[in-house]
Amino acid sequence: MGQKVNPHGLRVGVINDWDSRWYAEADFADNLVEDYNIRTYLKKKLYSAGVAKIEIERASDKLKVIIHTAKPGVVIGKGGAEIEKLKVEITQYTTKKLNLEIKEIKKPDVCAQLVAESIAAQLENRISFRRAMKSTMSRTMRSGAKGIKTAVSGRLGGADMARTEFYSEGTIPLQTLRADIDYGFAEADTTFGKLGVKAWIYHGEVLPTKGNKKEGSDK
């Protein structure tokens, strides 16, 4: 089952933390829809900024949104103009007091979501899927990853029948829970239809001990 399940979801509570951190009883459904709407809006609005992950924390009447991006300057804007616009636009989805935090991704080449989006962008620019996958994978390995696997599905090269192509370098221990595996998914809109792109990146092992928390985790 290690090959079928989302690698991040499989490791939540072991070496990964939740992307949404809050507790609710009566308002659970409303909060869930609110989170979905905020994430969908931000992902669409900031697509060019290379947003890899959006974390949401709630506490009584406060809402904290943490945006992990490869281009913080694009999100913040000149003199903070863009981030102020974002705050105003997000308030249409929530009535709570909003706190927006931007975190920079230092190495975008080893972030699975950004790698998948990079391959998808190349496919939209009519670059061969093999060339796009192999060049991106070699760049990721040079940046310090211990392993990478990519998959592209759809009408590859305009073929009449859809298929899936996999390429991998290094090791990807999907069923090892202590293995820190990042996962990303993106879609490419081409003249032949949509292509799905998946990326798995292995960063090494993390020992889940009480005193040793993974970087970026609030546990």
Swiss-Prot record:
One of its GO terms (biological process) is translation. GO terms for cellular component: cytosolic small ribosomal subunit. Pfam families: KH_2 (PF07650), Ribosomal_S3_C (PF00189). Keywords: Ribonucleoprotein, Ribosomal protein, RNA-binding, rRNA-binding. Residues 38-106 form the KH type-2 domain. Binds the lower part of the 30S subunit head. Binds mRNA in the 70S ribosome, positioning it for translation. This is Small ribosomal subunit protein uS3. GO terms for molecular function: mRNA binding; rRNA binding; structural constituent of ribosome. SUPFAM superfamilies: Prokaryotic type KH domain (KH-domain type II), Ribosomal protein S3 C-terminal domain. It comes from Lachnoclostridium phytofermentans (strain ATCC 700394 / DSM 18823 / ISDg). It comes from the Bacteria. The gene is rpsC. PANTHER family: 30S/40S RIBOSOMAL PROTEIN S3, SMALL RIBOSOMAL SUBUNIT PROTEIN US3C. Part of the 30S ribosomal subunit. Forms a tight complex with proteins S10 and S14. Belongs to the universal ribosomal protein uS3 family.
